[in-house]
Amino acid sequence: IVIASDGYPESYSKGDVITGLDDIQIEDSRVFHSGTALEKNDIVTNGGRVLCAVALGKNVTEAAANAYAVAEQIDWKGSFYRRDIGYRAIKRERDEQSN
Protein backbone atom coordinates (compact mmCIF):
# COMPACT_ATOMS: atom_id res chain seq x y z
CA ILE A 1 0.00 0.00 0.00
CA VAL A 2 1.69 3.23 -1.10
CA ILE A 3 1.07 6.03 1.39
CA ALA A 4 1.42 9.37 -0.35
CA SER A 5 1.35 13.06 0.49
CA ASP A 6 -1.70 15.17 -0.31
CA GLY A 7 -1.22 16.77 -3.71
CA TYR A 8 0.77 13.88 -5.17
CA PRO A 9 1.53 13.52 -8.07
CA GLU A 10 1.42 17.31 -8.44
CA SER A 11 2.81 19.60 -5.73
CA TYR A 12 2.96 18.34 -2.15
CA SER A 13 4.37 19.59 1.12
CA LYS A 14 7.61 18.35 2.63
CA GLY A 15 8.75 18.25 6.23
CA ASP A 16 5.53 16.92 7.80
CA VAL A 17 6.27 14.72 10.83
CA ILE A 18 5.26 11.08 10.33
CA THR A 19 3.71 9.37 13.36
CA GLY A 20 2.85 5.77 14.16
CA LEU A 21 5.90 4.03 12.73
CA ASP A 22 7.18 2.91 16.14
CA ASP A 23 3.77 1.56 17.17
CA ILE A 24 3.28 -0.99 14.39
CA GLN A 25 3.07 -4.53 15.73
CA ILE A 26 1.44 -6.38 12.85
CA GLU A 27 3.23 -9.72 12.45
CA ASP A 28 5.07 -10.27 9.15
CA SER A 29 4.75 -6.64 8.07
CA ARG A 30 7.23 -4.05 6.85
CA VAL A 31 7.22 -0.37 6.00
CA PHE A 32 9.54 0.72 3.21
CA HIS A 33 10.67 4.34 3.03
CA SER A 34 11.03 6.23 -0.22
CA GLY A 35 10.07 9.87 0.30
CA THR A 36 11.27 10.37 3.86
CA ALA A 37 14.02 12.28 5.60
CA LEU A 38 15.37 12.50 9.13
CA GLU A 39 15.14 15.95 10.72
CA LYS A 40 16.47 16.08 14.26
CA ASN A 41 14.82 12.99 15.77
CA ASP A 42 11.74 12.99 13.53
CA ILE A 43 11.05 11.10 10.33
CA VAL A 44 9.41 13.59 7.97
CA THR A 45 7.95 13.60 4.49
CA ASN A 46 10.34 14.43 1.67
CA GLY A 47 8.51 13.26 -1.43
CA GLY A 48 5.13 12.41 -2.91
CA ARG A 49 5.19 8.61 -2.56
CA VAL A 50 6.41 8.55 1.02
CA LEU A 51 6.03 5.01 2.39
CA CYS A 52 4.92 1.56 1.32
CA ALA A 53 3.16 -0.74 3.82
CA VAL A 54 3.35 -4.47 3.08
CA ALA A 55 2.33 -7.59 4.99
CA LEU A 56 1.99 -11.33 4.65
CA GLY A 57 -1.05 -13.47 5.37
CA LYS A 58 -2.35 -17.00 4.87
CA ASN A 59 -4.09 -15.75 1.70
CA VAL A 60 -4.47 -12.55 -0.33
CA THR A 61 -7.43 -11.36 1.73
CA GLU A 62 -5.53 -11.64 5.00
CA ALA A 63 -2.34 -10.13 3.56
CA ALA A 64 -4.28 -7.13 2.25
CA ALA A 65 -6.08 -6.68 5.58
CA ASN A 66 -2.75 -6.79 7.42
CA ALA A 67 -1.17 -4.27 5.04
CA TYR A 68 -4.13 -1.92 5.47
CA ALA A 69 -3.88 -2.32 9.26
CA VAL A 70 -0.27 -1.14 9.01
CA ALA A 71 -1.20 1.80 6.77
CA GLU A 72 -3.96 2.87 9.18
CA GLN A 73 -1.44 3.27 11.99
CA ILE A 74 0.75 5.70 10.03
CA ASP A 75 -0.21 9.36 9.81
CA TRP A 76 0.93 12.83 8.86
CA LYS A 77 -0.89 15.93 7.72
CA GLY A 78 -2.34 15.16 4.30
CA SER A 79 -1.40 11.48 4.09
CA PHE A 80 -3.57 9.25 1.91
CA TYR A 81 -3.62 5.84 0.29
CA ARG A 82 -5.90 3.97 -2.06
CA ARG A 83 -8.37 1.63 -0.44
CA ASP A 84 -8.84 -0.69 -3.42
CA ILE A 85 -5.41 -2.31 -3.69
CA GLY A 86 -5.75 -6.02 -4.39
CA TYR A 87 -9.52 -5.98 -4.83
CA ARG A 88 -9.45 -8.12 -7.98
CA ALA A 89 -7.29 -10.80 -6.35
CA ILE A 90 -9.49 -10.73 -3.23
CA LYS A 91 -12.65 -11.10 -5.33
CA ARG A 92 -11.11 -13.99 -7.28
CA GLU A 93 -10.06 -15.66 -4.04
CA ARG A 94 -13.56 -15.30 -2.57
CA ASP A 95 -15.16 -16.60 -5.76
CA GLU A 96 -12.89 -19.66 -5.70
CA GLN A 97 -13.75 -20.34 -2.05
CA SER A 98 -17.49 -20.18 -2.71
CA ASN A 99 -17.30 -22.77 -5.52
Language-model regions, residue ranges each:
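Peripheral (often C-terminal) accessory segments that flank ATP-dependent C-N-forming ligase machineries
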Residues: 2-99
